[in-house]
């Protein structure tokens, strides 16, 4: 793809090859033009492309004789008025013509076009025109008739012997609203009077002799191919100028410019069977070339005209309707730096046609064209397929050559081309609803005192931490924060079940008090959660009977100081959203006192057996101590909820069974929850403080930010080395970050802008570079279209990263955390992008292995950075390849699938290969469930029969294995290795990589990624570690043991659950698991740890050895949840009364259950008044269900609410409800299955339409006081005996 200065040409040729025959202009044609019938007018309106208003008119014969100043014609300024004026005038002129030349006699007579144009011009300017009428019909020739006396009849003509001079009449006419606006059409100086003169003769030789004796410094132009109205030369007027900012061009250049653009357009449209009026539309320079230099616009347009004639095409398509803006940009490209890269150069006296040019104009025209056999272009013949503009920047993937430059040169050129400083849009660092975490009281957990619970960070009120919280809040995309938090809290609170009754603590139609209600919510004078709550529109949250509001800022309630006693009344549920910072500010002692007062107010306002929620802004030990002493002994259960919306330590405490004495305590579950909670806060606080400030001006100094450069009129094949280095420098600055390009017009120039983002990861990769690898510009060269720019956005993904991106970020964090300065890394399945180079220290040598070729440069690195293109599961290649740490992420499953291997076989082969290496640590992501096998809808489908994972989003299918099998393979190769199943920590520490790389996170995606990690964990193998022996069943609630040989009596063992210390042998009494004991057998030299666990998950072990307490990894073990089998045993006789039917449920008591209904693919909690779980006298679990006719039309499931992910362990369909036979001899209950209209039929006859606007209750029906529909908002009716069916409408 060649460039002619700044104009880029396509890499193919195309040219018209069939020319239409010239048809003589007759009197009939002239009269038809003078009629100006709609659709056949001798003019064409031209519009402003922005406003769509008609701002100019293009004129055709016979209107091309307007040579006087426009005011002499008396034209109206508006197009509609002008068009009416023209039709009236031309109609009058037509009758004058027909009076002299009756159509019956002269219809097919040939008209002299010169005279026709002059006639119309004279008539419209109210000048004498009758003397021209005798010359209208051609007698000899158009030129011959006017030479001599004929030329004196109009100022339109002038005779010079055998040469006729004709004033070039206007081809365009401005309307009053033409302002030379950027979006107005260009008129090429042809709207000006006397912009050029045409010189006609019967032969070119006569014209040449004439110009020998006349000044031709303005440049004489010629149309060789089918010149209009005869052989002629055109002499532009130097004094007539047209604006093409920043250039002012004369009439000669304007005419050259218009003609070559017409030819370039014709080349693109050319088709083999499509005839054109003229094969070559271009003007060519016949005389005056000696007056123009190669840097002049005239000369360069002459080159472009020659190229267009030869069939070249512009790589950038010419718009159907030109604008001044586009034309200015094109002229700027013509005049930009560069050279003519084609073999064609203009000759003054003839037009060169290359031997292999598709143009046939030299055969169709006998004069002016010479085909050169020795001149060959070597290009394919094909019309360019033009593309429409792209409305936003497009991603660009750089590719590298072997060329290099100094790093300093790259930095220098980036500094010259950069668009910094600029103020980018910040975007959102987090989107979506609350990411909720919770813990509730579990009597099987170990008792914990308030003094053992984690403490609020001492630095919480420091200025930099306040800044971090503020930034996170500003950049967090959320609607009404209170609404999101309140909704999340209510959903969790309403799931709590009283283990003594099997019923939910919170049910429908309970009275509610809302403490801290505010009228300061957008669009409402009350908390936004209240209306959907009352209307039953919050999934899983039944409506209350009433909500009374209290607080400082209420509009629909009572103004009161909630921290002091007040006559509130009793409520079954009290919800307190009071902020302690209103009165307490940042004084912890005051705020703790306020919490105590609020807790007291809530206790007093809650009816016996009721529940309350209190927001705790600052969860300190004094607060926990107060709850421990005053609240826990007077409630039957509790829950702590963190609806993570913004980054703070705020929590919600939920109390159930108020005013009922108990012996509740804090538990180890609360301890683990709070450790995660505070770590999560500190993690995100640290990250937020490293991000640029909200609304910042990016000058390139922040570690995270925008990088953008712009190049004007880029021509890449001959671009300056400096510009290429600048693009390469930007690529070095941003590493693997997404790069987008825009190519557009700006102030008359064609601009390429490349935008990306820098981060600590990209800086790490740049630090590894010794030389700057130079990009291959080919992929940018081919961009002929316009790609419109957009304002840079720091966090640009409005919907947030996908679950797969979040999962990858989790793996990246673990790899980054495992490698230290100087570690030698062997990365398997690197991928073309080699992300590993951004994750490990710049001082760490690395070997990257992948079966695919790398997209990274080579030979430019500071330390050894090697890329091997091979199958890492093959034998023999690893000899001599060093790697202290081996990493393999998101690769082994695909490798196994590609080789049709089981995962066990692929893993075994990998271990076999690595056993011959020098590796000390292997970090490999494996396909292996670490929890109950459960598909993740839309993301992971698990075929447990064939042990296959299917990823629907990618259409991939991979094998998987199990933990025991993989551990066995490892220990066969390395008997003394320690194996750690790297747990996913819920403190979100992995988000550091994501946020500092400007990745927008999504709550929903994180939840899915956390689930996927359970099936695709990281396995860490410390090859030279010390193994542990597991004995017993590592199942929640059961006894199990670890035997650890090879240590001394003074060594200490620590066990971690997520981020928290679960126990230490240094003080087993402080353990956070129900039971642990540690014994050292001096004879065997081994430790035995006996344990009972209450939480399922991954636990990691670490030994502190010797007096220096050197840490040694012992690996990990997994504590499983109890068996998930569940059965439902229905009695032979079902009870259709309000007493309901008792169903025996067999399930491990570890699991808490609730009933759900699945509607339109969405899970909804079923009404607790319909399904109630309780323990029978014998201790078995019983589910009481009240039967409804609608049950046959719904899908009910029992699901566990044990984990953070509802239904993760148990999802059991209640299939009998879809097949029960309804009795016809007793009253039944009937509800609508959903909110659609349903026709109720009895014995086939329609009785009524439920949910219809005109619904009338049948006379023999009654309304049940408390609905037993799955939804508390759908009423239930008592209907008489009958055979009922329901049909949706």
UniProtKB/Swiss-Prot annotation:
Offer an example of a GO molecular function term for this protein: mRNA guanylyltransferase activity
Membrane-crossing residues? none
Identify the residues that bind ATP.
Answer: 893-900
Q: Keywords, A to Z?
A: ATP-binding, Capsid protein, GTP-binding, Methyltransferase, mRNA capping, mRNA processing, Multifunctional enzyme, Nucleotide-binding, Nucleotidyltransferase, Outer capsid protein, S-adenosyl-L-methionine, Transferase, Virion
Entry-linked Gene3D superfamilies: Immunoglobulins (2.60.40.10), Reovirus components (3.90.1810.10), Reovirus core (3.40.50.10760), Vaccinia Virus protein VP39 (3.40.50.150)
The task this protein performs is described as: Outer capsid protein involved in mRNA capping. Catalyzes the last 3 enzymatic activities for formation of the 5' cap structure on the viral plus-strand transcripts, namely the RNA guanylyltransferase, RNA-7N- and RNA-2'O-methyltransferase activities.
Q: Which family does it belong to?
A: Belongs to the orthoreovirus lambda-2 protein family.
* Name of the molecule in the record: Outer capsid protein lambda-2
Q: Which organism is it from?
A: Reovirus type 3 (strain Dearing) (T3D)
Underlying gene: L2
């Amino acid at each position: 793809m060649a460039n002619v200065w700044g104009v880029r040409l396509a890499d193919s040729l195309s040219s018209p090859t069939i020319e239409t025959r010239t048809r003589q202009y007759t009197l009939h044609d002239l009269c038809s033009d003078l009629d100006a019938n709609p659709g056949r007018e001798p003019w064409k309106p031209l519009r402003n492309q922005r406003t769509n208003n008609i701002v100019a008119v293009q004129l055709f014969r016979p209107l091309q004789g307007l040579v006087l100043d426009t005011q002499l014609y008396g034209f109206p300024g508006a197009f509609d008025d002008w068009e009416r004026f023209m039709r009236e005038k031309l109609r009058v002129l037509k009758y004058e013509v027909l009076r002299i030349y009756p159509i019956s006699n002269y219809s097919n007579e040939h008209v002299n076009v010169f005279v026709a144009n002059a006639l119309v011009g004279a008539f419209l300017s109210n000048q004498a025109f009758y003397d021209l009428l005798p010359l209208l019909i051609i007698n000899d020739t158009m030129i011959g008739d006017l030479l001599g006396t004929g030329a004196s009849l109009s100022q339109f003509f002038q005779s010079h012997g055998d040469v006729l001079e004709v004033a070039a009449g206007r081809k365009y006419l401005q309307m009053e609203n033409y302002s030379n606006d950027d979006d107005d059409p260009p008129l090429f100086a042809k709207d000006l009077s006397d912009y050029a003169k045409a010189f006609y003769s019967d032969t070119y030789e006569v014209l040449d002799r004439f110009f020998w004796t006349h000044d031709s410094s303005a440049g004489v132009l010629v149309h060789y191919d089918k010149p209009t109205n005869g052989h002629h030369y055109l002499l532009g007027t130097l004094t007539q100028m047209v604006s093409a900012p920043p250039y002012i061009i004369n009439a000669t250049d304007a005419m050259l410019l218009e003609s070559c653009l017409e030819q370039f357009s014709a080349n693109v449209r050319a088709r083999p069977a499509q005839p054109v009026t003229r094969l070559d539309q271009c003007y060519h320079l016949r005389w005056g070339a000696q007056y123009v230099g190669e840097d002049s616009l005239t000369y360069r347009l002459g080159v472009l005209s020659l190229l267009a004639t030869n069939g070249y095409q512009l790589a950038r398509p010419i718009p159907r309707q030109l604008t001044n803006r586009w034309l200015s940009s094109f002229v700027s490209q013509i005049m930009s730096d560069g050279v003519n890269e084609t073999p064609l150069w203009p000759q003054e006296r003839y037009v060169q046609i290359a031997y292999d040019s598709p143009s046939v104009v030299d055969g169709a025209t006998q004069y002016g064209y010479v085909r050169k056999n020795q001149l060959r272009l070597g290009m394919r013949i094909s019309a360019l397929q033009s593309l429409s503009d792209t409305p936003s920047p497009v991603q660009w993937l750089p590719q590298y050559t072997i060329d290099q430059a100094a790093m300093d040169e790259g930095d220098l050129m980036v500094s010259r081309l950069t668009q910094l400083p600029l103020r980018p849009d910040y975007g959102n660092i987090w989107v979506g609803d609350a990411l909720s975490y919770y813990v509730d009281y579990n009597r099987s957990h170990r008792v914990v005192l308030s003094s053992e619970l984690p403490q609020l960070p001492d630095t919480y009120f420091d200025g930099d931490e306040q800044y971090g919280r503020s930034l996170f809040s500003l950049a967090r995309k959320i609607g009404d924060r209170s609404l999101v938090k309140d909704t999340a809290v209510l959903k969790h609170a309403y799931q709590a079940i009283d283990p003594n009754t099997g019923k939910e603590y919170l049910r429908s139609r309970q009275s509610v008090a809302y403490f801290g209600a505010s009228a300061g919510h957008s669009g409402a004078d009350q908390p936004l959660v209240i209306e959907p709550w009352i209307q039953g529109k919050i999934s899983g949250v039944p409506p209350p009977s009433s909500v009374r509001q209290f607080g400082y800022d209420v509009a629909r309630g009572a103004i009161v100081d909630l921290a002091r006693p007040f006559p509130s009344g009793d409520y079954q549920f009290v919800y307190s959203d009071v902020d302690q910072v209103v009165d307490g500010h940042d004084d912890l002692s005051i705020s703790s006192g306020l919490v105590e007062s609020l807790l007291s107010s809530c206790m007093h306002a809650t009816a016996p057996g009721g529940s309350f929620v209190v927001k705790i802004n600052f969860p300190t030990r004094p607060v926990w101590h107060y709850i421990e002493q005053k609240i826990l002994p007077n409630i039957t259960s509790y829950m702590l909820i963190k609806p993570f919306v913004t980054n703070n330590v705020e929590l919600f405490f939920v109390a159930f069974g108020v005013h009922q004495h108990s012996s509740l305590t804090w538990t180890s579950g609360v301890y683990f929850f709070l450790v995660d909670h505070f770590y999560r806060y500190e993690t995100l606080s640290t990250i937020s403080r490293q991000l640029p400030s909200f609304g910042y001006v990016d000058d390139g100094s922040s570690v995270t930010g925008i990088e953008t450069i712009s190049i004007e009129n880029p021509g890449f094949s001959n671009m300056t080395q400096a510009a290429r280095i600048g693009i390469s420098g930007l690529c070095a600055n941003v590493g693997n970050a997404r790069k987008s390009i825009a190519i557009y017009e700006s102030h008359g120039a064609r601009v390429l802008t490349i935008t990306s983002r820098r981060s600590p990861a990209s800086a790490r990769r740049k630090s590894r570079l010794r030389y700057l690898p130079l990009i291959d510009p080919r992929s940018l060269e081919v961009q002929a279209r316009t790609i419109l720019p957009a304002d840079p956005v720091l966090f640009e993904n409005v919907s947030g990263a996908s679950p797969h991106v979040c999962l990858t970020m989790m793996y990246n964090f673990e790899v980054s955390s495992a490698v230290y300065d100087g570690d030698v890394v062997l990365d398997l399945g690197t991928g073309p992008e080699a992300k590993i180079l951004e994750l490990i220290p710049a001082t760490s040598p690395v070997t990257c292995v992948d079966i695919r070729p790398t997209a990274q440069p080579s030979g430019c690195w500071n330390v050894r950075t090697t890329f091997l293109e091979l199958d890492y599961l093959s034998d023999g290649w690893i000899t001599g390849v060093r790697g202290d740490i081996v990493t393999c992420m998101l690769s082994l499953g695909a490798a196994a699938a590609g080789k049709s291997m089981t995962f066990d076989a692929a893993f075994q082969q990998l271990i076999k290969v690595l056993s011959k290496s020098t590796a000390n640590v292997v970090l490999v992501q494996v396909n292996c469930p670490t929890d109950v096998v459960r598909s993740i809808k839309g993301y992971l489908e698990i075929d447990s029969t064939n042990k296959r994972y299917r990823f629907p989003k990618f259409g991939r299918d991979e094998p998987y294995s199990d933990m025991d099998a993989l551990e066995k393979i490892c220990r066969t190769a390395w008997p003394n290795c320690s194996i750690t199943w790297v747990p996913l920590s819920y403190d979100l520490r992995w988000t550091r990589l994501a946020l500092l790389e400007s990745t927008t996170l999504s709550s929903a995606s994180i939840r899915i990624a956390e689930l996927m990690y359970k099936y695709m964990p990281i396995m860490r193998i410390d090859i030279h570690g010390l193994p542990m022996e597991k004995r017993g069943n590592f199942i929640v609630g059961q006894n199990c043991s670890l035997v650890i040989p090879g240590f001394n009596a003074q060594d200490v063992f620590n066990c971690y659950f997520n981020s928290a210390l679960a126990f230490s042998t240094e003080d087993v009494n402080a353990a956070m698991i129900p039971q642990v004991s540690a014994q050292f057998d001096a004879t065997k030299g081994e430790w035995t740890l006996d344990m009972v666990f209450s939480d399922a998950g991954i636990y990691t072990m670490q030994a502190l050895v010797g007096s220096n307490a050197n840490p040694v990894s012992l690996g990990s073990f997994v504590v499983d949840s109890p068996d998930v089998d569940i059965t439902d045993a229905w009695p032979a006789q079902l009870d259709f009364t309000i007493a309901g039917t008792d169903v025996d449920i067999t399930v491990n008591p570890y699991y808490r259950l609730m009933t759900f209904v699945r509607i339109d693919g969405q899970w909804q909690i079923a009404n607790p008044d319909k399904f109630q779980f309780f323990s029978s006298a014998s201790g078995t679990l019983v589910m009481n269900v009240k039967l409804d006719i609608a049950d046959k039309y719904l899908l009910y499931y029992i699901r566990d609410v044990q984990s953070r992910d509802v239904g993760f362990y148990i999802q059991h369909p209640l299939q009998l409800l879809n097949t029960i036979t309804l009795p016809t001899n007793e009253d039944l209950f009937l509800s609508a299955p959903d909110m659609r209209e349903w026709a109720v039929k009895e014995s086939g006859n329609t009785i009524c339409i439920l949910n219809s606007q005109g619904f009338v209750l049948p006379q023999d029906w009654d309304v049940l006081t408390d609905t037993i529909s799955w939804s508390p908002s759908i009423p239930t009716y008592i209907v008489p005996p009958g055979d009922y069916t329901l049909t949706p409408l």
